[in-house]
Amino acid sequence: MRLFSLLPLLALLVVQAAGQSEVTSDDPATDAGSTTNSTTDTKPRIPSQDEILGQMPSINPIRTGNPQMDAFYMMFPALGSLLKWGSLFPAYSILGAIPDNLQPTAAASKVVLVLADDATAKTRVARQNPPPNPLGQLMNWPALPQDFQLPSMDLGPQVGSFLAQLPAMPTVPGLLGAAAPVPAPAPAPAAAPPPAPAPAADPPAAPVPDAPQPAILGQAALQNAFTFFNPANFDASSLLGQSVPTFAPPNLDFVAQMQRQFFPGMTPAQPAAAGTDAQASDISEVRVRPEDPYSQEAQMKIKSALEMEQERQQQAQVKDQEQVPLLWFRMPTTQNQDATEEKTLEDLRVEAKLRAFERQVIAELRMLQKIELMAKQMRSSAAAQNGDSPYRISYPLSRTPIHKITRADIEQALRDDYVRRLVNKEAQRRARNSGINTQKANALKRQAKSQDQTLSKEDIVQIMAYAYRMANEQMESEKGKQDKVYAAYRTEQNPMMMQQRQWSEEQAKIQQNQQQIQQNPMMMQQRQWSEEQAKIQQNQQQIQQNPMMMQQRQWSEEQAKIQQNQQQIQQNPMMMQQRQWSEEQAKIQQNQQQIQQNPMMVQQRQWSEEQAKIQQNQQQIQQNPMMMQQRQWSEEQAKIQHDQQMAQQMAQQGLMMTEQRQRQWSEDQAKIQQAQQMAQQTPMMMPQMQQRQWTEDPQMVQQMQQRQWAEDQTRMQMAQQNPMMQQQRQMAENPQMMQQRQWSEEQTKIEQAQQMAQQNQMMMQQMQQRQWSEDQAQIQQQQRQMMQQTPMMMKERQWAEENPQSVQQQGPMMMQQQMPSMMQREVEDEDNKAEDDLVGEAGPQMPENEGTARHKVDALGVGGNKRKKSKSKSAPPTVINYYYAAPQRPVVQSYGTSYGGGGYGSNAYGVPRPVNSYQSQGYRAAVGNDEVDEMLRQHQTMARTINPKQPGEVGGSESQKSNSNPPTTLTPAPQEQPQEHRVHKRLAHFHRFGREAGLNATTSKGCGCGRLDCLCGRSCRCGRRGLESRVVSSRTSGTCQCKASHRNKRSVEYGTLETIDEGSLNELRREYKLGLKEITLSPDEDPAEALMRYNAASIREALERASMEPLEIGGDQYEEDAQQEPMEEEQLQHDPNTEPQYNHKDFVRLTTSTASPITSTTEAATPTGSDSTSEATVTPEVTTTTSTSTTTTTESTKDEGLDMQQDSQAEAESSHVTKSISKQEAEIHQLHSIVEELKNEILKLNLRCSTIISNNVAKEPVTEKNPPVVEEPSKQEDKPKVEEKVIAEEQAPVEQEEELEEDEDSTSISTTTETPSPSGSYSTKPGLSLGSPRVDEQSGSSNKLDYDDDNNWQRILANRGYDTDYLTKSHERQFAQGQNLEMPKNCNYDGNGSQEYGPYPEFQADEPSTDTEGKAKRALSVKQQAQLLNAALNDSGSDSSDGTTTTTTPSPYAMRGKFVRRRSTARRVPIPKIGKASDEVWVRSPRQAKMPQRPKKSMSKPKKQSSQVTTQATVSSTKLDSLVDVLKDLVRLQIQKEKKSSLLRTQSNNLSKTKPKSIKPVKVIKRKRLRRRQHKSIATTIRSPIQTKA
């Protein structure tokens, strides 16, 4: 059906489809546009966009409710919207009438439909109960303003007949008026009529009959619709009057009949399909409640006759353009690129939408063609099988070019059941596949696919209106243009006469056009060669920036400027000039050839002019596809050449051409001569002048000669004088021109000799240009054709046109035109190349990654699943993809609490934090173990863990170095100097493990060398030798003996983001967790569990070290503590203090720098190991603490080694149980065996100690009495300090404290030793805790006689799982009485010590309140134990006093953070419960791992105080009794205060009191702090011998 017939259908469709909206005034623009192509002389009034859009129903993705229509619209959203909103397509009629229930009900209240059987109607329109008819929409679609003239809409004669039949024509307006319930006889737009009736309805069939009635209906309906919709906006009569003739479509009859015909039974939903008139009544009357002052119906009746007439007239026109292509709106888009110059931004936007819409429509038409073709095949196959199909259907689409497809074609195609079926199937498939995906994409993905319905109805209407307007403008412009073009063709045909005429006309036009073109880019759209020439000239002038006249006028100024420019150009030779010049020459030659080819150009009668025009024409042709005439020109080149010759031979042309050419020749010669002279004078200027003259000669000469012949003559003189001036002027006018000219001049410089010769040749050639023009015309015809065919050539020409360079280059091109055609070709080739280079489009910078996201780039090229992020893929190559310096801190998955920067506490293993363990330093890529190791070493954060320490470096110096150099940058620090805490820890480890246990590299996990720097990344020193030689060099497994050196899957220090095997992950956790300072417990989490969970690796390592290294009970820790309180304990304190010192702060740093976990881990672990082994003797405090926190208990066990070992074992077991880490379990079992060994050793040591104590008791009691006294004050002093620290720690992570306390309790056996351990753990408070333990140890030494007894019961309790650190005399009493101690076994000590107090509170309270004797006894026993241990260790020479190690072990926990402190606090906390008095502190010391540590110290001969402690312990034992009484009182007071104070405060008080109680421990703690801060090697030295003993 013709578009007009379609239009009514579309209107109906619109009414139905858009029926939901009151009025789907389909784009008036669209209809008009489609009509527009049909030439409508009267420019219809285009309703304002508001008017149009106001009537448009909101275009939701077209949902009609009609499954077929919906399927069609889904499949062809653009096409459907075009047909629907553009009113170009009776979608419903094609696809079948809309079921009544689906009929959109518009404002039903406004329209009263009187349905009656229409006797006249051939087919009764099925009454659509939801009346909103497509007709209503058709009526709406008169909303298509008058503008829309559907030129090609031929409603089939059926439509006319239908309309005639439709007695309810008034109903049409009613329908229109009521976008609503109008049942519109055409529920299925006419297009939809079943194929059988289709013939009548076929658009081609009845365009004429349609026209008259549709005109009437359309106009009346449209009027009514308009008046109804926008009575004010649309003058229905005017709109309809103008537009109706354009589209007669509103043939309700036609639509209805089409529907009936084509879809008699199309959709059951359409009860009254063509065949079935279940709803037999047609619309006999539509009564619209007049919204408008006048009745639409009346007006419709009034206008009906007039409109009928108009529509008849329209129909005649429609016949001419019987079928308006659906893409009628495509013409204006491609029309004049020049038009864009005058287009407003809004127009450009609309045009962009229009083009996008056009592309969409084209794509959908192609798809529809494919579907139709497939349907054709299906039908043919079905017919072959079943015989002939019931009716034959022609498949127009597949045979019709897309741009010629009309609505009728689509209707006819959709008439086919197969096509509809295929469309439905495809739509269903898409709905299934893409529908869900689209929803997902829209909902879930940023790359949400835009819905198929990209354009809203408003957009489409706007687009169509714009297209229609453009079409009208185009038609108008094309009329004149066609006349001009025809004139041009006639000129070509009659070159002599036409050339003469056109030449005069063209010069006038050119001048006018130049002005107009300058003023009116629309003139460009006219695409008149004259205009184009004018525009080209204008462009030349504009390029020159000086209008032709200005150039003429400003010769003097321009000369000066040009001379200057030339000088500048001369100064600035540009090699490009040569290329461009050649290119320009090629272009100019091409242009000349085209000009030669184009009689129009010949008419200019100057090759220069012709060349300029041809260039212009070519450019415009390039710009204006309309100018495809270029090919015609090229084809006509031969004719044109002849014409040119003829024209040139023309007397007028001969005169004009001859005069101009003679003048040009003279000018050119003069210019050339001048240029030669200038060139001789200024070789640069000469070629430039020549080139410019050539360019100007064609351009300027054309302009000047055309405009001012006299001026041309003067210019000949001027040209002789001023050719350079012209060029200079142009150059001055156009810096680009200048540059181009510079290039050309440089080219000319280079080619100057050639050009000089060429200039002569050019003289000759210009003389010969006619021949050349002919020859070149042919050659360049081919070239032009090539160029036309070659988009680059077209682009080049456009580019040349766009760029003044091209125009300027035309000058050189002019010269080249005189040059051989071969040179031209070469130049053109160069031109193409240059254009490719110059005009080339930007391509993807990474073409190989063109379609992929950057994160998918395989930076290493290792391959793998490209769709997966390499981080997530565990590919065989171990790749740490630090892809590039990430602009933002990459998220690091925290594998441990401290790993990953921010991950403390419960979220330790949780969601990766934005905090980058790599310090936001960006990712670097390393492949392979060596590269990874080296990179990690260089990586400061990782280097902390990996960097080998120079064994010679003392902890203090190294720590200072590393402190100075925090790992803040990813730039590989030479050794990635570790942070202070790491360095301290590393030094501590090094001193403890490195020196003392460095030789012991037998640990299963680590070499036991205690070197954090171990090449294997472990805290083993075995690789130190190699590391010393090559610190940063990638470690080779050869250097390191430990397994870790060969990292199969992942080494702890590799902070890779890739998946890590469990073992490696555990190692990572151990290494990085060792750096933890504090563990944040979940509210309901048991501290012990948390400790085990977080510290399993650390515990394991500590146990390993304990097994590997001697237990150091020694007084180094005490000495460190004592150093703070300069007393005897200073001697004892020196070793452990170093480590505890940095434990807290350094651990904090460690925690902060999370990346340094290994170092801190090593230190912490090392203390743990050393303490476990040696600490029993020397550093029981630290060991115990460490054991408590991790498995330091085992280390402490050497003091109360059995008990501590059991505790540590229990802790280890619980930790491995908690973590369920098989590795840890194995290690724990190993640790258990080690603990057993340690227990045995400790028993032996105890025996020795008992022996030694018996010897030393007499001596030491006296000695120790004084220290205890001093201890008490110092304890009291320290209590506040401890309390403060404890408070801080408690406040910080109470949970950690609890964990510490738990560990302490669990280490109750090593309570004595563990007290130092807590201080060690505490690295913040290490001095205090250690100090108090040391005091205890001293008193313990004095008590060593009691120690045997106490040691026995303490050991028994420790074996039972009590934390010996917290054992007090009251506990001893309870134990003696066979009572269960009221202290928790391996209690989780809340930061508040609540759990610890759970058992301890009574026991602690008991200590002061129950029996001072118990305290004294316990203190004595602890001291005795310490003495015995120290004596045994010293005697046995087994320097199990790993005071250093012990400190180290606490250190890891200190690294753990407040955790360690809390342990110290926890141990002290029990005392607070006992009392705040120094006695309570003393009670706290009863955890006298510390005291035993002193004995350990005495045991560890390397530690001076070990022996001293023994002596002192013996002496102080007597004093301890007195002190115990005092402490009892203090404890009572403290308990009272504790009751008053909060648990945190109580704990802090207890801690502080505990320290006061063990005055020396306080000093020791202080000294330990100092030493930790100082990281004195002395402590390390002392520890090392002790460790050696172990």
Swiss-Prot record:
Comp. bias intervals (Acidic residues): 1119-1130, 1295-1306
Basic residues: bias regions: 1493-1504, 1554-1576
GO MF term list: cis-regulatory region sequence-specific DNA binding; DNA-binding transcription factor activity, RNA polymerase II-specific; structural constituent of egg chorion
UniProt keywords, alphabetically: Repeat, Secreted, Signal
Protein name according to UniProt: Defective chorion protein, FC177 isoform
Biased composition (Polar residues): 32-41, 957-977, 1205-1221, 1577-1590
Annotated Gene Ontology cellular component terms: egg chorion; extracellular region; nucleus
Region span, Disordered: 23-60, 184-212, 268-294, 843-875, 944-983, 1119-1221, 1261-1352, 1375-1515, 1538-1590
Subcellular location as annotated: Secreted
Sequence repeats: 493-518, 519-544, 545-570, 571-596, 597-622, 623-652, 653-680, 681-696, 697-720, 721-733, 734-758, 759-788
Bias type Basic and acidic residues, positions: 1131-1148, 1272-1288
Annotated signal peptide: 1-19
Function field: Required for proper assembly of the eggshell.
Feature: compositional bias, Low complexity: 268-280, 1151-1195, 1307-1319, 1435-1452, 1505-1515
Region (12 X 26 AA approximate tandem repeats, Glu, Met-rich): 493-788
GO biological process: chorion-containing eggshell formation; egg chorion assembly; response to starvation
InterPro entries: DEC-1_C, DEC-1_N, DEC-1_REPEAT
